Amino acid sequence: MFVTSKKMTAAVLAITLAMSLSACSNWSKRDRNTAIGAGAGALGGAVLTDGSTLGTLGGAAVGGVIGHQVGK
């Protein structure tokens, strides 16, 4: 079974996000939620727009705003 470059990119992005967030243990809960939302939004935007840069950045922006507002 062959792994497509899109799936490989998504896996690398998810692993990088998880590793980078673990290094930020002194962040406030709101900061963590914002970063997680931005990462999830970027991943979702990239998948939905077939890797479009604009879709990835838009997803990250929307996800970051949603993550920031969660639990307010």
Swiss-Prot record:
Lipidation (N-palmitoyl cysteine): 24
InterPro entries xref list: Gly_zipper_2TM_dom
Membrane topology note: Lipid-anchor
Positions where lipid (S-diacylglycerol cysteine) attaches: 24
Pfam families associated with the record: Rick_17kDa_Anti
Superkingdom of origin: Bacteria
This protein's record includes keyword S-adenosyl-L-methionine: no
Induction, per UniProt: By elevated osmotic pressure in the growth medium.
GO biological process: response to osmotic stress
Keywords: Cell membrane, Lipoprotein, Membrane, Palmitate, Signal
CC terms in the record's Gene Ontology section: outer membrane; plasma membrane
Protein purpose: Provides resistance to osmotic stress. May be important for stationary-phase survival.
Record-given protein name: Osmotically-inducible lipoprotein B
Chain's gene name: osmB
